[in-house]
Amino acid sequence: MSTGEAIPRVAVVVFILNGNSILLGRRRSSIGNSTFALPGGHLEFGESFEECAAREVMEETGLKIEKMKLLTVTNNVFKEAPTPSHYVSVSIRAVLVDPSQEPKNMEPEKCEGWDWYDWENLPKPLFWPLEKLFGSGFNPFTHGGGD
């Protein structure tokens, strides 16, 4: 790996809470293919974390979110990926503007589909950074207090 080419990037991932469930989609990607992951993506120049969260969720799922709160930041290095990469991932908690709204798969080339999963019964396999975060005892429902 040439570290001169691998520059860390900032990603924003979103824990959308709906009752006792979170929204997850099965990835179609060279990194973490077929694992379950949160909606999210790259922070664009000049964007706030909240703006990025709202934009990415809308682009990927068609959902409108609100009451966004910064939860945690993780450092994820994918040395074994076909193209090694390094992401600083900012985790945001949010809720739906309209709780009756259902997710749509707006980017089928990147995701097999979105669904709500009960916090006590999450699907496997989870995307490695998410598995690592949950393994540390992280809980998006209680971390950082209430809104």
UniProtKB/Swiss-Prot annotation:
Q: Where is the Nudix hydrolase domain?
A: 7-140
Where along the chain is Mg(2+) bound? 56, 60
The record's statement on gene disruption is: Increased level of 8-oxo-G in genomic DNA.
Q: What is its main location?
A: cytoplasm
- What is the enzyme's main class? hydrolase
The organs and tissues expressing this protein are described as: Expressed in roots, stems and leaves.
**Pfam families, alphabetized:** NUDIX
Cofactor info, note text: Magnesium may be the real cofactor in vivo.
What terms describe the molecular function in GO for this protein? 8-oxo-7,8-dihydrodeoxyguanosine triphosphate pyrophosphatase activity; 8-oxo-7,8-dihydroguanosine triphosphate pyrophosphatase activity; dihydroneopterin triphosphate pyrophosphohydrolase activity; metal ion binding; NAD+ diphosphatase activity; NADH pyrophosphatase activity
- The short motif Nudix box is annotated over 41-62
Q: Name one GO cellular component term.
A: cytosol
Q: Does the keyword Aminoacyl-tRNA synthetase apply?
A: no
Q: What is its EC number?
A: 3.6.1.55, 3.6.1.67, 3.6.1.22
PROSITE patterns documented for this protein: NUDIX, NUDIX_BOX
What induces this protein's gene, according to its Swiss-Prot or TrEMBL record? Not induced by paraquat, salinity, high light and drought.
> GO biological process: any one?
DNA damage response
Identify which cofactors the protein needs according to its UniProt entry.
Mg(2+); Mn(2+)
The record lists the catalysed reaction(s) as: 7,8-dihydroneopterin 3'-triphosphate + H2O = 7,8-dihydroneopterin 3'-phosphate + diphosphate + H(+); NAD(+) + H2O = beta-nicotinamide D-ribonucleotide + AMP + 2 H(+); NADH + H2O = reduced beta-nicotinamide D-ribonucleotide + AMP + 2 H(+); 8-oxo-dGTP + H2O = 8-oxo-dGMP + diphosphate + H(+)
For this UniProt record, the keywords arranged alphabetically read as follows: Acetylation, Cytoplasm, Hydrolase, Magnesium, Manganese, Metal-binding, NAD
Quaternary structure, from the entry = Homodimer.
The job of this chain, per UniProt, is described as: Mediates the hydrolysis of some nucleoside diphosphate derivatives. Its substrate specificity is unclear. In vitro, it can use NTP, dNTP, 8-oxo-GTP, 8-oxo-dGTP, dGTP, dATP, dTTP or dihydroneopterin triphosphate (DHNTP) as substrate. Has some NADH pyrophosphatase activity in vitro; however, such activity may not be relevant in vivo due to the high concentration of manganese used during the experiments. Plays an important role in protection against oxidative DNA and RNA damage by removing oxidatively damaged form of guanine.
Q: What family, per the record?
A: Belongs to the Nudix hydrolase family.
Instruction: State the protein's name.
Output: Nudix hydrolase 1
> Which species does this protein come from?
Arabidopsis thaliana
Q: What is the lineage of its organism?
A: Eukaryota, Viridiplantae, Streptophyta, Embryophyta, Tracheophyta
